Amino acid sequence: MDTLKDQFVVPGDVIGKIGDLKVRIGPGLLQTKDTVLATKAGVLRYSKFHRFYWIENEQKRYVPQVEDMVIGTIIEKHAESFKVDIGSSCSALLSAYSFEGATKSNKPLLNVGNLIYCRVTVANRDMEPEVVCLSQKQKAEGFGQLIGGYMLNCSLGLSHYLLSEDCFLLQILGKHIPYEIAVGVNGRVWINSGSNHNTIVVSNTIYNSQYIQDDQIEPFILKSLSINETSGLVEQN
């Protein structure tokens, strides 16, 4: 895997064999058995802090793929559907019946500006994306409106890292702060905690994790918690 690190790769290039390596792969990479292939053109990057490989390119905008879990904002409300901003070039369509238990007489009470956690079901360059607030089992299972809290924008690579099963960062945060989190692969993270201060700490920790080593994360959290007053949430470009 290291032989192509910081090298330009194109779709179809064999990046290497994972074997027994304990690494994670992110945007632009696909694992087939124990082989990792490039699916987009760009520079292969590796974070030694997070043991995380991904392909970095000029893509700034999220490109929907079927089964992606994303965070969206309601931008239009219609009788039986909603338009949702998911950060892609086109808004997504959400049916009012794509919620657990939804019927003609029991539709979700969503308004423009509301946040939702949803799943992409249609992603075709010739059609607008479609999303649902249901799991593959047709249950809510965490999908639906995100009430309260704070939404943080981050890189697509960081959002994929946060979704990994053994994400060290979220484990350490959970030791010190009770919180809820929803992570979208479209580079959006929703956080809700018991207080504004704790929500700020979680947000700042996630944002700054891109620039500090794993062994610096816990001291960063403890220092942040010791501050009684903060000036506000992280600034974003």
Curated annotation (Swiss-Prot):
InterPro entries: Exosome_RNA_bind1/RRP40/RRP4 (IPR026699), KH_dom_type_1 (IPR004088), KH_dom_type_1_sf (IPR036612), NA-bd_OB-fold (IPR012340), RRP40_KH-I (IPR049469), Rrp40_N_euk (IPR041054), Rrp40_S1 (IPR037319)
Keywords associated with the record: Cytoplasm, Exosome, Nucleus, Phosphoprotein, RNA-binding, rRNA processing
Gene Ontology CC terms, in alphabetical order: cytoplasmic exosome (RNase complex); nuclear exosome (RNase complex); nucleolus
Cysteine disulfide partners in this protein: none
SUPFAM superfamilies in alphabetical order: Eukaryotic type KH-domain (KH-domain type I), Nucleic acid-binding proteins, Ribosomal L27 protein-like
Family: Belongs to the RRP40 family.
Binding partners and assembly: Component of the RNA exosome complex.
UniProt protein name: Putative exosome complex component rrp40
Natural source organism: Dictyostelium discoideum (Social amoeba)
